[in-house]
A protein has these predicted regions:
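Metzincin-family zinc-dependent endopeptidase catalytic domain
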Residues: 13-116, 124, 128
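Short, Lys/Arg-enriched, disordered terminal segments
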Residues: 1-6, 159-162
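Generic structural signal for residues positioned in beta-strands
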Residues: 7, 73-75, 99-100, 134-135, ...
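Fold-level signature of zinc-dependent metallopeptidase catalytic domains
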Residues: 3-16
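The catalytic-center signature of Zn2+-dependent metalloproteases
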Residues: 105-162
């Protein structure tokens, strides 16, 4: 069973106004028992790609999941991220473990950021990309991410509950 506790690590550069309302949103959507928000103390330089000027998102996810012994962990970072084979990613997730979300391309828009966090946490809870109008729709650009729904479709909602 996936933990019902969430620990959010926030890049200290990110304005608190960006994450106002995030805690209530995540409790409503995912029914977390507890959410703890704290500033990220250190981002490992080993995850930084100097040629690309981006963080490798899977490296960040491995790092934060090794630092948090129990529960789901979410890193919200201000820098750009990528994974092998893609120019950039809004985020990356691992089922039952946690997620990394970069706000670099999300225009400092709290609703846009919540949408991408909801998407990545959907993956943490086992959801795949969805082809219906849904927050789980794959986005390959800022435009596509902007256009997708802010909530789960009925199919994904049912899958989350099972």
């Amino acid at each position: 069973m996936i933990s019902s506790d969430l620990r959010i690590l926030v890049d200290p550069i990110i304005s608190p106004s960006i994450i106002i309302g995030l805690e209530n949103h995540l409790i409503d959507v995912f029914s977390f028992d507890s959410i703890e928000i704290s500033k990220l103390v250190q981002i490992p330089s080993s995850c930084w790609n100097t040629v690309r000027q981006q963080f490798e998102a899977n490296c960040l996810l491995a790092y934060i999941s090794s630092q948090i012994p129990a529960g789901i962990v979410l890193l919200i970072i201000s820098k750009d991220t990528y994974i092998q084979g893609l120019n950039f990613v809004f985020g990356v997730a691992s089922k039952g473990i946690g997620a990394v979300v970069s706000i670099y391309r999300l225009e400092n828009d709290p609703e846009f950021i919540q949408k991408e966090i909801t998407h990545e946490l959907g993956h943490v809870f086992g959801l795949k990309h969805c082809f219906l109008p849904c927050v789980m729709t794959f986005s390959n650009s800022v435009r596509e991410a902007r256009l997708k729904n802010t909530s789960f479709c009925e199919k994904c909602r049912k899958e989350m509950k099972s």
